Amino acid sequence: MSSPFQDVAPRITGNPKVREPQQGAYEALAQHVADGADIREVSVVLPVGCGKSGTITLTPFAYKSKRALIIAPGVAIATQLAADFDFSSEKLFYARCDVMDGPNYPEPVEIRGTDANRSDLDAAHVAITNIQQISGDGNKWLRTLPADFFDLIIFDEGHHSVAATYEALKAKFPAASVVNFSATPLRADGQMMSGPVVYSYPIFKAIRAGYVKQLKAIQLNPKTLRYVRRPGDSEVEVSLDEVRRLGEEDADFRRSIVTSEETLNTIVDASLRELDRLRNLTGEPRLKVIASALNYEHCIQIVEAYRARGRKADFVHSRESKKNDQVMQRLANHQLDVIVQVRKLGEGFDHPFLS
């Protein structure tokens, strides 16, 4: 099967619409391939905001891939990546950044569920899915594919790629080259991302170029804190010295602090003051708050606190899978001031107006 990744010369180097880190990563990967080094797996480190999704669309060109498989860490990221390859979408990276001309765009297929149409896979030049879709033994489409079906595997948030599920996927397609993309090469458990880093774009350059927002912490300094004591759900006030001691020793205490009404109200009010300040400073009313919750009940508690202050707020959670699409559409349409999540909009999720 002929592939545009092999037949088309993309306009990348020197293209003003392609960002410096995107060009640099592509050139480093292409050079790695040209060098012919016997290294199957490599890594690219790009800070959030530098255009990692766009760089992923360029990577199959660097490898002159016949058919690539792209693995995202979750559904939200997979959907974003699929849009960058979708030639019916205004988000198509190749058209948006003048990388190549139609109609010879690579044919994408997005894999959802445990079954996939084999004819769609056979016709595709790139398949996009999330790691949960290929976990376990229930994925019929994966088991039926020959070992040489993909010649390139790309992991978004690739610092997870040392995990067992990722290793099993690499073993399924043993001849495929592997590229890991991440903003950090280090996992939470201390393991490093697999493969040598062939390109890394410094965070200070990303900030200077305006790809990454200047980050500023807002410190709240109460004299005392209240926490929820269980059982009974009564709130207890403690001194800061006691907070420090209990916080170092007791994980349940740390969770109780953030579920306290008084603590929640303090954080909500501070976040809204900062949101209003940024909106007034920039003249951009579409800026939003993203808040992380501990669990489903905490999601509801936070949303209700923002709504009580007259703000449009909602949440996404794995328990509300059908509702999540509606909430994400409201977020995209700027119909929310606040989005609350529990490990649902994690690493790699990008929305330009989350402040």
Where are these regions (language model features)?
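N-terminal pre-P-loop "Q-motif" helix
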Residues: 15-38
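Walker A/P-loop
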Residues: 36-59
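Conserved Walker A/P-loop ATP-binding site and its immediately adjacent core
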Residues: 58, 62-96, 294-297
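Inter-Walker segment of RecA-like/P-loop motor cores
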Residues: 91-137
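SF2 helicase catalytic motif II
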Residues: 131-134, 143-180, 184-185
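Conserved helicase ATPase core of P-loop NTP-dependent helicases/translocases
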Residues: 141, 300, 312-343
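Interdomain helical connector at the RecA1-RecA2 junction of SF1/SF2 helicase-like NTPases
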Residues: 191-286
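A short beta-strand element within the Helicase C-terminal
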Residues: 338-341, 345-355
